[in-house]
Amino acid sequence: MMARSLEISIDELGPVSLQSKENIEISSMCSVFAESEVISLIAQNKEIADIAHGIHKAIAGKAMSLLKRVGLNPGYMMTGGVAKNPGVVAVLEEQLGEKLHIYEEPEIIGALGAALYGLEKIL
């Protein structure tokens, strides 16, 4: 949704955000309202890289609030498709103050865990 609003591909979103020079805040947690903010920033002629970075900061901020609920313990692993986005990964690593462990093909880790759990239950 956000990549489409910025008229770039989803694969470009992460690398583009790493070129950011201006700190932009996206305050909405709702994706529809956040998209409205993005469209407004585009109308203000803000740089695509800066907007993308703002989007990634909002995503990372939400992840950080969830992490704080369960407790921050060093040695973080990131799974899921978002782990393939270098922009989100960079912001999270900055906020955590350490490197994230990301395995090859992070988007299948949840399914792999579910399969192993299911296998354990039937054996």
Regions inferred by a protein language model and the residue ranges of each:
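Glycine-rich phosphate-binding/hydrolytic loop that grips phosphoryl groups
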Residues: M1-R4, Y103-L123
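A short helix-loop
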Residues: M1-V32
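Internal alpha/beta core interface subdomains
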Residues: A3-I8, K57-G61, M77
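Short helix-capping/linker segments at secondary-structure and domain boundaries
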Residues: L6-D11, K46, L67-G71, L119-L123
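Beta-strand segments within the central parallel beta-sheet cores of soluble alpha/beta enzyme folds
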Residues: E12-Q19, G75-M78, I102
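Adenine-nucleotide phosphate-binding core of ATP-dependent small-molecule kinases
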Residues: A34-L67
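A short glycine/serine-rich beta->alpha loop
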Residues: K46, K99-P106
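Glycine-rich phosphate-binding loops at beta-strand->alpha-helix junctions
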Residues: L67-Q95, E107-G110
